């Protein structure tokens, strides 16, 4: 049972449409794009959209993984939209983005997990803009050749989130996700394309201990991960 508690002032945000929020939202609607900001009901999206920032979500808006922390819809997926890469590129161009983040739902139903669609999207954005490009990818577990196919597009940053410590993996990420595979995916990226920066992130406050976090930090260092983000889990809202 969820208990409603008063949030501290620094977590509360106005729901106004001022600044660039309306412009960003309008463009996303016009081009019929998905963003993780909306699909995951991120509580920070008003702040991000007001500054012209958005994380584009490709491969549809229905995920094949039932991660407990995420509000993205789960269920029956739809066919890929062939012109989606060009629409993402057009949005990035019109927003004047200097750094573009492309993420996706997990598509276990696709033979390559959506890797080639990622490749096409990165290439379209690069052709349309001078922005640096970061991909935040699912694990592609069991998808032979998927990582190699995606990396043909040479993203500037390859991001795959660890999310939590190994002890909590099944509870937080579901039975299909494997901690060791996450580390392998990040390490294999460096082997295939040494010049690519790798990145991972964790949510704090899910019941992990300090010692468990330090072990994950060590594991990521040992697998040549360049960047680590740490965030506090905020329940999906709005």
Give the location of each predicted region.
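Conserved Radical SAM active-site core
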Residues: 51-157, 162-168, 178-195, 200, ...
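Flexible, acidic/Gly-rich N-terminal and inter-domain linker regions that tether
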Residues: 1-65
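Radical SAM enzyme [4Fe-4S]-AdoMet core and its adjacent flexible, acidic
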Residues: 170-180, 224-238
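Alpha-helix boundary/capping residues
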Residues: 28-31, 154, 172, 220
């Amino acid at each position: 049972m969820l208990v409603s508690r008063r949030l501290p002032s620094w977590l509360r945000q106005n729901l106004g449409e001022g600044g660039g929020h309306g412009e960003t939202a309008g463009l996303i609607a016009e081009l019929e794009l998905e963003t993780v900001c909306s699909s995951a009901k991120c509580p920070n999206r008003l702040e991000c959209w007001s500054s012209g920032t958005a994380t584009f979500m490709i491969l549809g808006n229905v995920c094949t993984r039932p991660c407990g922390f995420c509000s993205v819809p789960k269920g029956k997926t739809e066919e890929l939209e062939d012109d989606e890469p060009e629409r993402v590129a057009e949005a990035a161009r019109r927003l004047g983005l200097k750094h573009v983040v492309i993420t996706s739902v997990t598509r276990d139903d696709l033979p390559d997990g959506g890797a080639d669609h990622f490749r096409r999207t990165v290439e379209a954005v690069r052709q349309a803009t001078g922005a640096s490009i970061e991909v935040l990818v699912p694990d592609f577990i069991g998808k032979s050749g998927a990582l190699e196919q995606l990396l043909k597009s040479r993203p500037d940053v390859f991001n795959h989130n660890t999310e939590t410590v190994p002890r909590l993996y099944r509870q937080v990420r579901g039975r299909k996700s494997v901690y060791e595979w996450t580390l392998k995916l990040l390490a294999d990226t460096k082997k295939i394309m040494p010049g690519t920066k790798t990145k991972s992130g964790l949510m704090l406050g899910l019941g992990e201990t300090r010692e468990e976090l330090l072990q994950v930090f060590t594991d990521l260092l040992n697998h040549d991960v360049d960047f680590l983000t740490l965030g506090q889990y905020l329940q999906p809202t709005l």
